[in-house]
């Protein structure tokens, strides 16, 4: 288990730097120990910086979830960062790539 915390008084830029460091160093190290990228991750909420969120958060279910989303939301009206099909949207969720 890896833990990253910060004081509430820390600036937003410093918090972002801590999150980036965790995503770039601790998470890959833990994935290597746990048997690879399909081992999963949990940071109290989906880490917006997670580079492989499809596998990390959804695992083998991602393809099936894409099909379900295509039925109920064919125009991708409902999107969230690091959610199903969010990789086709810009970082602000305003425009498709």
Question: Model regions: which residues?
Answer:
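Cofactor-binding catalytic cores of oxidoreductases
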Residues: 1-97
């Amino acid at each position: 288990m890896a833990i990253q915390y910060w004081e509430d008084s820390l600036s937003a830029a410093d918090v972002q730097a801590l999150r980036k460091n965790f995503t770039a160093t601790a998470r890959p190290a833990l994935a290597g120990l746990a048997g690879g990228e399909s081992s999963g991750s949990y940071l109290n909420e989906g880490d917006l910086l997670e580079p492989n969120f499809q596998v990390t958060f959804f695992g083998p279910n991602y393809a099936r979830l894409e099909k379900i989303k295509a039925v109920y939301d064919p125009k991708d009206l409902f999107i969230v960062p690091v959610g199903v099909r969010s990789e086709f949207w810009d970082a602000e969720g305003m425009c498709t790539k």
